[in-house]
C-alpha cells in the first residue's frame, strides 16, 4: 500500500505540474503547502497536505557584509575581431598596466605598506636591508657646482696632453716641456714619446723625464707673491748665486708634515727679475698659469719704482716717454711719472709702467735718457700690488681674488 501511495503521489505531482504548466521564467515563487489527493479502485480517495520547510539561511559573506551581487563588476571588452563581449574579470592588459603604474609612480606608498607589515623572521629583515641600497642607487643625487668642481679637482683624473701633465707636475713651462718631448727626453710606459699631444694619465701611465719619474698623484697647485731681495736670481742655472726659490726651503721642508702622502710641488718663478732688482715676483708650480702670465699677449701692466743718481729734468722724462730699442724692438713705456720728494729718501724717484716686460727694459729706458739707475723695485703686476707689510725675502700665498687681479681665470 505504501508503494502504491508513493507511486500515486509521484504520478500526481507530475500530473499536477503538467496541469499548472508553469511558464519558464527567471522568477520562481516558493510553495509552502501542497494539497494532495490519492485514490484507487479498491479504496476511497485520501486527501493530505505536504508542507515544505523553509530553506536554510546561507552563510554570511566573508567580504565584510558585501553580497556577491556587489562584488560582481561587469567588464565590456572588445575582442580582436571587433565584437563586444561581457566578462566578469578585467582584461589582462589592464591588470598589467595597473601593476606597472603602482610600482613606478607610487614608490612611497609601497614603502609605507612595507613598513606597516611586521618583520616575521630575521631573513626577511636581511632581505629588506639588502634591497634598500639598490633602491637608493637608482636615484642619482644632484650635486652642486662646488661639489662637482671639488670632485673634478681632487678625484676625477682624465687623460691629458703629455706637455700639460709635465707642466702641471712642475717639470717646466708648457713650451719647455714640449721641447723636452721633441728632444726625446720623455718616455711613457717605457716607450720614447715625441708627440706633446699624446694623452696620458699620470695615475696609470709611467712617465719619465730625464730619468726621473713623474709621480702618479700630481701635487696641488700653489701660488705665491715673493718680495725678492737684491742678490737673488730667478733661474737655477748659476750655482754660485742664490736662487729666489731657495727662499722657500723652509716651506718645502715642512711640506710632508702639512700634506702627508702628497708629493712636493716643484716651484719656479713666473718671469724674471735681474739679480739687482727687488720687489714683486710670482712663484708657482702651475705651468699654465706661468705661461699665461708671462706671455706677451697678456699685456699685463708692470709698475716699477726706480731711484736715480742726480737730478731729473723735463728732458729726461721726455726721453724716457719716447722709448728706446730693447732686443731689437722699440719699447715705449705706458707712463712715466716723477714722484714727490721725501725727507727720508734723498734721491729722486720715477714711477714707470710698462706692459711688454722685456729683459732690462726699464733700465734701458732710464739709461737711454742719460740717467743712472741706483735701485729698481717692481711693486705691481696687473691689478695686484705688492703688500706694503711684506718684508724682503718673505712670501705670501695668493688668494683666488688676487689671482683674478693678475688676470688668471681658472
Swiss-Prot record:
Keywords: Chloroplast, Isomerase, Plastid, RNA-binding, rRNA processing, Transit peptide. Its main location: plastid. It is an enzyme of class 5 (isomerase). GO terms for cellular component: amyloplast; chloroplast. It is found in: Plastid, Chloroplast. GO terms for biological process: maturation of LSU-rRNA from tetracistronic rRNA transcript (SSU-rRNA, LSU-rRNA, 4.5S-rRNA, 5S-rRNA); maturation of SSU-rRNA from tetracistronic rRNA transcript (SSU-rRNA, LSU-rRNA, 4.5S-rRNA, 5S-rRNA); plastid translation; pseudouridine synthesis. Residues 107-117 have a biased composition (Basic residues). Disruption phenotype: Yellow-green leaves and significantly reduced plant size. Impaired rRNA processing and translation in chloroplasts. Highly expressed in young seedlings. Expressed in roots, rosette leaves, cauline leaves, stems and flowers. Residues 160-229 form the S4 RNA-binding domain. It comes from the Eukaryota. Residues 96-143 are annotated as: Disordered. The active site is at 274 (nucleophile). It holds the Pfam family S4. Residues 118-135 have a biased composition (Low complexity). One of its GO terms (molecular function) is mRNA binding. Belongs to the pseudouridine synthase RsuA family. Responsible for synthesis of pseudouridine in chloroplastic 23S ribosomal RNA. Necessary for normal chloroplast rRNA processing and translation. Required for normal chloroplast development and maintenance. May function in other plastids, such as root amyloplasts. This is Putative ribosomal large subunit pseudouridine synthase SVR1, chloroplastic. The lineage of its organism: Eukaryota, Viridiplantae, Streptophyta, Embryophyta, Tracheophyta. The gene is SVR1.
Amino acid at each position: 500500500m505504501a508503494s502504491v501511495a508513493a507511486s500515486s503521489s509521484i504520478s500526481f505531482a507530475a500530473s499536477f505540474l503538467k496541469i499548472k504548466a508553469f511558464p519558464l521564467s527567471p522568477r520562481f515563487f516558493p510553495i509552502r503547502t501542497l494539497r494532495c489527493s490519492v485514490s484507487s479502485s479498491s479504496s476511497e480517495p485520501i486527501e493530505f497536505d505536504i508542507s515544505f520547510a523553509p530553506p536554510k539561511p546561507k552563510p554570511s559573506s566573508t567580504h565584510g557584509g558585501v553580497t556577491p551581487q556587489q562584488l560582481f563588476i561587469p567588464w565590456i571588452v572588445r575582442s580582436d575581431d571587433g565584437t563586444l563581449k561581457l566578462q566578469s574579470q578585467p582584461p589582462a592588459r589592464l591588470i598589467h598596466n595597473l601593476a606597472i603604474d603602482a610600482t613606478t609612480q607610487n614608490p612611497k606608498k609601497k614603502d609605507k605598506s612595507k613598513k606597516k607589515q611586521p618583520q616575521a623572521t630575521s631573513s626577511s629583515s636581511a632581505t629588506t636591508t639588502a634591497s634598500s641600497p639598490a633602491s637608493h642607487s637608482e636615484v642619482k643625487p644632484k650635486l652642486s657646482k662646488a661639489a662637482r668642481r671639488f670632485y673634478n679637482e681632487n678625484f676625477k683624473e682624465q687623460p691629458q696632453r703629455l706637455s700639460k701633465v709635465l707642466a702641471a707636475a712642475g717639470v717646466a713651462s708648457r713650451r719647455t716641456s714640449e721641447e723636452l718631448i721633441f728632444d726625446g727626453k720623455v718616455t711613457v710606459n717605457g716607450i720614447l714619446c715625441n708627440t706633446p699631444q699624446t694623452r696620458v694619465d699620470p695615475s696609470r701611465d709611467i712617465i719619465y723625464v730625464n730619468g726621473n719619474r713623474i709621480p702618479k698623484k700630481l701635487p696641488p697647485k700653489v701660488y705665491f707673491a715673493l718680495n725678492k731681495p737684491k742678490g737673488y736670481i730667478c733661474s737655477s742655472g748659476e750655482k754660485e748665486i742664490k736662487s729666489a726659490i731657495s727662499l722657500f726651503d723652509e716651506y718645502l721642508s715642512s711640506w710632508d708634515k702639512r700634506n702627508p702622502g702628497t708629493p712636493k710641488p716643484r716651484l719656479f718663478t713666473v718671469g724674471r727679475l735681474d739679480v739687482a732688482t727687488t720687489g714683486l715676483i710670482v712663484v708657482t708650480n702651475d705651468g699654465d698659469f706661468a705661461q699665461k702670465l708671462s706671455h706677451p699677449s697678456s699685456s699685463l701692466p708692470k709698475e716699477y719704482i726706480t731711484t736715480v743718481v742726480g737730478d731729473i729734468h723735463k728732458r729726461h722724462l721726455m726721453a724716457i716717454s719716447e722709448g728706446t730699442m730693447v732686443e731689437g724692438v722699440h719699447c715705449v713705456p705706458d707712463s712715466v711719472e716723477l714722484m714727490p720728494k721725501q725727507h727720508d729718501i734723498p734721491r729722486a724717484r720715477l714711477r714707470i709702467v710698462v706692459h711688454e716686460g722685456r729683459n732690462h727694459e726699464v733700465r734701458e729706458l732710464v739709461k737711454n735718457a742719460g740717467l743712472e739707475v741706483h735701485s729698481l723695485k717692481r711693486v705691481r703686476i696687473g691689478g695686484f700690488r705688492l703688500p706694503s707689510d711684506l718684508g724682503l725675502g718673505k712670501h705670501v700665498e695668493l688668494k683666488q681674488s688676487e689671482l683674478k687681479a693678475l688676470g688668471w681665470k681658472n
